[in-house]
Regions:
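GHKL-family ATPase ATP-binding module
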Residues: 1-247
């Protein structure tokens, strides 16, 4: 982790008792970290998103934001966040800032592209982060954490700094890499469709369960209208007649 989070640093560990030594040095910073994490995964696009920028939050304080992201064909999110090389397994304000900026930029990009013309899908942050591998590294003076274990960052100035850097860089990335942007957006749209299909399947199962518990006939078709004052019951003879009645 340290060799990835501190680009250019070479770490040499030697055990003189056993004559063993290990050298850790990786190029690319957190971008190389993402590539290392995805080494056994199927990456759906070639160009890894990467940005490294320092933001001035007040005359005496600078925050360095380094982010790398790449989507795979998986269904789970792999998100690693660090502040001054300390990992935050519970996230914090820096993670909230990144997710907020990423969701806003990608949703706007899809709405303004040809995807929105084909179909209208309400995207969520979970849809956008499906299959995502992301490493966020923050360098800032005097960070504040929720506890002594430092598992969650609570410094309020971290969120706007990360949002600013990620929003600008991600907008440029999508415009400059249209092929990768299309692949990423198609992956996100597929995730949204799957979520919506699962929701409808759950609703159908619950409705059927309610009908079954009421002792109604198994061939009774569900109502397409939710307002019961507008619903009617049609009694027809035979399955073929039932199909015609539904139409």
């Amino acid at each position: 982790e340290l060799s990835f989070l501190n680009n250019g640093v070479k770490i040499h560990l030697a055990d003189l008792r056993k004559g063993k030594d290990e050298v850790f040095q990786f190029a690319g910073g957190v971008s190389g970290f993402v590539d290392f994490i995805n080494r056994d995964k199927t990456k759906i696009h070639d160009n890894c998103f990467y940005t490294n920028k320092t933001v001035t939050v007040n005359p005496e304080e600078n925050i360095n934001v380094e982010v790398a992201m790449q989507w795979t064909d998986g269904y789970t999110e792999n998100f690693l966040a660090y502040t001054n090389n300390i990992p935050q397994k519970d996230g914090g304000t820096h993670v909230n800032g990144l997710r907020s900026a990423m969701t806003a930029v990608i949703k706007r990009y899809i709405e303004e592209s040809e995807f929105a013309k084909k179909e209208k899908i309400d995207l969520t942050g979970e849809d956008i982060r499906e299959g995502l591998t992301c490493v966020l590294s923050l360098k800032m003076p005097e960070p504040k954490f929720s506890s002594q274990t430092k598992d969650k960052l609570v410094s309020s100035e971290a969120r706007p700094a990360v949002e600013q850097v990620v929003r600008t860089a991600l907008e440029s990335y999508l415009q400059e890499n249209p092929k990768d942007a299309r692949i990423i957006c198609e992956k996100i749209m597929d995730a949204a469709r799957a979520r919506e299909a699962a929701r409808k399947a759950r609703e159908t199962t619950r409705r059927k369960g309610l009908l079954g518990s009421a002792g109604l006939p198994g061939k009774l078709a569900d109502c397409s209208e939710r307002d019961r004052s507008l619903c009617e019951v049609f009694l027809v003879e035979g399955d073929s007649a039932g199909g015609s009645a539904k139409q």
